[in-house]
């Protein structure tokens, strides 16, 4: 059996040993998975050779199903973002070759950072032992095994990862996502019913939307401005840009993407949820062949007391992106020198479809550069935030640098433009961004204020450079800058 990549599609050629030729057969199922059309290979029954299986050989029930339960079915289930379900033996058996291949080559589960394991919390990758179990199971004919609890061998866990939330906030009414092919960006306002301030240590989003959500972010708005925009729109939610009054909690980023594993903030790092606040839930939605109802839920887990630690978000970015059509290696650089010492708690890189490579380094005053994050095959569909198990300590004077590489050529299979077009900085997926958010923890209040003042100057500089670049591109477009 052979697999071929043809453009954005994976095709299957099935070899018939009796005819000693390639059958003229190709089965493709086009699925709109997170904005990119891919082909799902449909393996037919009976192509796998029957083998005598040793009694101690790996089986589906005893060995493979637990791996699928833990790592795969969060996406590969009915209504999930995965293009097929893996909830039962027959579904796994018919795709045993594909499962073995993509796990052996670490294509699935998708995990983009390069480096040794156990650097980040909740890493979404298989161990070598798990990969070997799947490979051996396939090699031995993908036996089912026996168990009295076979029907429950794989469980699509629709429950909350951290148990029942202290509070569940739901959209007041579902949004009807019309059938189509163009991505939809929409904000939804969810009033939060708390009678007194609470401290939040964890947030989980349950999409409940049949694979329609590409990713989501949550911001807090106490001004009522987002609520007014929602009321002015006849449909649930509203379009356009995020209101300036809606912000992440200071030092935190609240987001969700398929396959995300939820972890609690470390002790003392909870954030304040005030009364009379609205959640502004921003959704990147993927229409399908039929209308879908979108109505996710937000689960909140409260801490017993107020936060004792106050993180600060350090942002590296470029608003001057201007990528010529056909350029296969457009490089974006930004750097920032820390005025105070910090512990680096988490890192969140962001780019769109033209992004290909990312490297983030830290060079302290002694000159010994260390890599904080490296991604060699960036995929907009699998963006994530990465929380360190052991936060690196970066002394004052450390230079943090980001280097992002973009491919705007026709050879980039994720290029949204055919033929390639000029792409500039902007919020749409067909625009580009280069952003890096670092969740940092200064030693104390004085250091926190010094860091925030320094970052305000950097943010102002970034915006000025962005406006200057926009004026150079189109001097007559004053409306977008007023």
PLM segments and residue spans:
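Short acidic/polar inter-strand loop motif in beta-rich domains
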Residues: 142-144, 286-291, 405-414
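Noncatalytic modules at the cell exterior or secretory-pathway interfaces
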Residues: 200-201, 270-286, 392-405
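Bacterial N-terminal signal peptides
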Residues: 36-47
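Solvent-exposed, flexible loop/coil segments flanking beta-strands in beta-rich domains
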Residues: 151-212, 290-354, 416-456
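Aromatic- and Gly/Pro-enriched helix-to-coil junctions and flexible linker segments
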Residues: 51-195, 206, 276-282, 287-289
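Extended, compositionally biased non-globular segments
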Residues: 346-424
